[in-house]
Curated annotation (Swiss-Prot):
PANTHER family: BETA-1,4-ENDOGLUCANASE (EUROFUNG)-RELATED, PTHR31451. It is found in: Secreted. Its main location: secreted. It comes from Aspergillus oryzae (strain ATCC 42149 / RIB 40) (Yellow koji mold). Keywords: Carbohydrate metabolism, Glycoprotein, Glycosidase, Hydrolase, Secreted, Signal. This is Probable mannan endo-1,4-beta-mannosidase F. Residues 119-463 are annotated as: Catalytic. Gene3D superfamilies: Glycosidases.
């Protein structure tokens, strides 16, 4: 689903210190700060460019190797938050076609202690969460990692836990081409002039996602995190294209772009690979390659899903697609076709793709009869059954009729054999006002919340 861009601000302040604080940079090429970590923390080398203070008993000074950066790979930086409150940037080489992809042994550790619970997994045609194998319900709140008020994030998870919603999908990307004002949340900067990309791990960067993961652990909610958007909201493919050239359809095969994308995947996966709060990683949100052969997305998905599994074999991986290009039950309408470069059944057969996803927006797709959606759900359930993998009804919504037609789709999802559903999207009042709102939003505590969420949960619990 396309999302409305929103910006959250945070003033980053701090006092200088002779020691590097928790999770701060403490070494690496060109680094001139302190290599001594605070008491109870030690300096661990993650690569030649970056060492970080991690939990441990002693402080050590990392060694620096002299391995040169491949000349054919774009520069990718990690912006680390230090105790002075000032971001320090250090360049690291991203993987390129001529450079072996990094293995999981070289990935950085999770930045937060992991909570209780177990890794979610596929169990036949269903999902197993913390020892329970059954049908699950959840929602989308793409905007949550961009909130700067911790209390707002805590409130969202309080409400999800109370409602029994076990799965939450949030954006794991926020790409920009111009450095925003200090304190503006972004995750990665693609600089066209410098030909570099910078990953922001500061207080207005991935530390916001850190808090979301920690809150999910606390409340027993599992997160789905995609790495890039096909739409321009929050950067998308175009943010890469503006910096490195090509087009949105060439994004999947552009070597420089893919090396930057893989470097970002490694940075995020390495932070949370030990967290039980991660339900699954997704290659992207609604990947499309308009007019392309289906081999393009299939080949890309095969390569990237295997790469993610090499970094983190414990969590599930999904494509994050809309479910287009389905032959089973096809009525030859636009969603069943392959014009957007997807072949649902072929992609589902990729060994490192653990489950299928489907989205449903009749109005946006030019479908006049909302009842059409019931067949869409049923036919995907059949395809997943044939593949022996679960199906996640990952996004669905309509402009109005939340309490009529959407409830019918939910009942179809329950009865057809899909494994879970996530309504688009969750909304609530925040300290700054309403959360990002579109025509599909279901706000907590409203009449629509009761019918579209609470009534649905009653049916889920009976299932």
């Amino acid at each position: 689903m396309r999302s409305l861009s929103s910006i959250a601000l945070l003033s980053v302040v701090g006092a200088a210190s002779a020691q590097a604080g928790p999770w701060a940079q403490c070494g690496g090429k060109s680094f001139s700060g302190s290599s001594e970590c605070a008491s109870g923390w030690k300096c661990q080398e993650l690569n030649e460019w970056f060492s970080q203070c991690v939990p441990g008993a002693e402080s050590t000074t990392p060694t620096v190797s002299s391995t040169p950066t491949p000349t054919d790979a774009p520069s990718v930086s990690i912006t680390a938050s230090v105790t002075t409150g000032i971001n320090k940037s250090i360049s690291v080489s991203s993987a390129s076609k001529s450079t072996p992809l990094p293995s999981s042994s070289s990935a950085s550790p999770s930045p937060r202690p992991t909570g209780s619970g177990s890794f979610a997994k596929a169990d036949g045609l269903q999902f197993s969460i913390d020892g329970e194998t059954k049908y699950f319900a959840g929602t989308n709140a793409y905007w949550l990692p961009f909130q700067m008020n911790d209390a707002d994030i805590d409130s969202v998870f309080d409400h999800l836990e109370q409602a029994g919603l076990k799965i939450l999908r949030v954006w794991g990307f926020n790409d920009v081409n111009t450095a925003p004002s200090p304190g503006t949340v972004y995750f990665q900067l693609h600089d066209k002039e410098k030909g570099t990309s910078t990953i922001n791990t500061g207080k207005d960067g991935l530390q916001r996602l850190d808090y979301v993961v920690a809150a999910a652990e606390k409340h027993g909610v599992k997160l789905i995190i995609p790495f890039v958007n096909s739409w321009d909201d929050y950067g998308g493919y175009n943010a890469y294209v503006k910096a490195y050239g090509g087009s949105k359809t060439e994004w999947f095969t552009n070597e420089k772009i893919q090396s930057v994308y893989q470097a970002y995947i490694k940075a995020v996966v390495s932070r949370y690979r030990d967290s039980p709060a991660i339900f699954a990683w997704e290659l992207g949100n609604e990947p499309r390659c308009s007019g392309c052969s289906t081999d393009v997305i299939h080949g890309w998905a095969t390569k990237i899903s295997a790469y993610i599994k090499s970094l983190d074999p414990n969590h599930m991986v999904a494509l994050g697609d809309e479910g287009m290009g389905l032959t089973i039950g096809s009525d030859q309408s636009y969603p069943y076709g392959t014009s957007e470069g997807n072949d649902f059944e072929k992609n589902l057969a990729i060994p490192d793709i653990d489950f299928g996803t489907l989205h449903l927006y009749t109005t946006d797709w030019g479908i006049k009869d909302n009842a059409w959606g019931n067949g869409w759900v049923e036919n995907h359930a059949k395809a997943c059954k044939a593949a022996g993998k679960p199906c996640l009804f990952e996004e669905y919504g309509m402009k109005g009729n939340h309490c009529t037609d959407e409830l019918k789709w939910q009942k179809t999802s329950l009865s057809s054999g899909t494994a879970a559903d996530l309504i688009w999207q969750y909304g609530q009042q925040l300290s700054t006002g309403e959360s990002p709102k579109d025509a599909y939003s279901i706000f907590y505590g409203t009449d629509e919340w009761k019918c579209a969420v609470m009534d649905h949960m009653e049916n889920v619990n009976k299932n």
